[in-house]
Amino acid sequence: MKRVKYDILVIGGGPAGMITAVTAKAYHKDKSVAVVRKNKRAQVPCAIPYVVGGRIESCQNEVPDAVMTKEGVDLIFDEIVEVDFCKKEAKSLNKTIYGYDKLVFATGSLPNIPPMEGVDAEKVFTVKKDKESIDALKKSVCEAEKIVIVGTGFIGVEIAMEFARSGKEIVLIGRESDILRQAFDKEFAKEGERIIRESGIDLRNSCNTERILTNEKNEAIGVELDTGEKIYSDAVILAVGYHPNVALAKKAGLRIGKKGGIWVDEYMRTEAEDVFAVGDCASKQHFLTRKTIGLMLASTSTAEARVAAISLYKIEYIKRFSGTISIFSTVIGDRVFASAGVTESEAVRENIDIVTATFEGTDKHPGTLKDTHKQIVKLIAARHNGTIIGGQISGGESVGEMINALGIIIENRMSVSSLIGLQIATHPLLTAPPTAYPIIKAAEMVERKLYGENFSSCERERIAETV
């Protein structure tokens, strides 16, 4: 067998693996870094619905390998099949043994396949992340006139909207009472559902898919619901989430967490010496409840990757990864929906005492300007000290960056009192007015609920200091 030695070896070349390698090379310039990736072309995972729907081609959705190679990272197209932590070696499918000083698992996730009759039939698809699978899915469904999509999470909703845009008849089926339930409270979900139905999609909430109907050729011809109703279609797409790809980690003996991810500490270290895990394959801990959660986001993955890469040789990154703040954004029709932190329904389930407020304004000023969108901001604060722990926003394109600002507010444990004094930049064509900036106005509403109209400013400051 051929033998090669690297200081830092990364298994997997998705967003987490790529950022781990690039950051490691930047912070440890004298170290050799290699990424071992099975697929020759890496896709932008979040844009897959727009490839499948025909808005762009898969070749336009590729992450350039130069992002890594220009920084001095070796990119190897191979598959690691065995790891020996004692020998610090990883064996590949192409019969190469890679030695390492530091090893990072970034093996990503795989689509869930529900245990139901007919899932192995022809014309049944899951949404995989490699170029070949994406192209195969797109080719197979392009001639389908009617498609059933099972799952009302982000992938299901976004693919449904893309197919509807191209004129296909779509039935979207979800077992939850609302779409995107992991990220949004009912009022935001209902706003999205209205747009979905106006797009011509037959949305079925609170429905369980019992089995996939097939013909004598073992081709899918529709689904049967738990009510006995049969919905016929030309293809079925299963978009019911993903699970951590940890087969290699399990084989190597790594500890696996409650939600199926590789157990890691706040520096992304596993229980094996000099072995780290990042991204979808790594376990996640909620920033507030500290419970293990099954969240998978590229933005979270890259944050973990930076923490791991900087911490490979010694703990220099003082602000360790302190938990996952769920930050989502999506587009339904011409409206942007975004969420950060805890939802109101989640807070109720976790018995967190909260105060909420919602402000509705516009994303330009005056609101009579062309292309002005209604903008809705909901803030969720802890009752005992006014700390912002969650929020949701809907509106125009500016929502995409507003939610990132809200994520920073949550991560830094800012209170509603501190938000009221926030200094912001505004412009008539770009933002809401300074007199009615939605995040600040929602914070004012929360504060009035918390402290009343006559609460003194010095008392507010005293409480804010305890945050």
Where are these regions (language model features)?
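Beta1-alpha1 glycine-rich phosphate/pyrophosphate-binding loop at the start
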Residues: 2-74, 112, 154, 162-187, ...
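Short hydrophobic core segments
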Residues: 11, 98-108, 231-241, 305, ...
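Flexible, glycine-rich terminal cap/loop adjacent to redox cofactors
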Residues: 11-13, 25-30, 38, 240, ...
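A Rossmann-like FAD-binding core segment of flavoenzymes
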Residues: 30, 71-91, 98, 166-264
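Rossmann-like dinucleotide-binding cores of NAD(P)H-dependent redox enzymes
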Residues: 47-56, 155-213, 295-300, 318-320, ...
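Glycine/serine-rich phosphate-binding loop and adjoining beta1-alpha1 elements at the start
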Residues: 86, 96-140, 429-434
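FAD-site-proximal beta/loop scaffold in flavoenzymes
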Residues: 120-143, 219, 229-310, 405-409
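A conserved FAD-binding loop/helix module that cradles the flavin
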Residues: 264, 278-342, 430-453
